[in-house]
Amino acid sequence: MNDDRQALTEDVLALLCSIAPEVDPAVIEHARPLRRQVDLDSMDWLNFLVGLNERFGVEIPESDYARLVSLGDVLDYLQAKLEQR
């Protein structure tokens, strides 16, 4: 993993832990559905997506929410959006 991807991963996991403090980031698998791994309800998930927007300045349209299933999906999405700047 390159340094930019590692930093992005750490930032995303820190945000996730701020919303769900019981989450152990060391056990999050990149390919499994994130909401199931950390048992986020719909409000927590929405707070997570809003937090991504605020932290990274990336607009996430509601139509894209369904694409953001796993941690890997979230990271790929953010990385692509950040590279478009």
Residue ranges and their predicted role:
Residues N2-L40, D44-V50, E54-R85:
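Phosphopantetheine-dependent thiolation modules in NRPS/PKS and related acyl-activating systems
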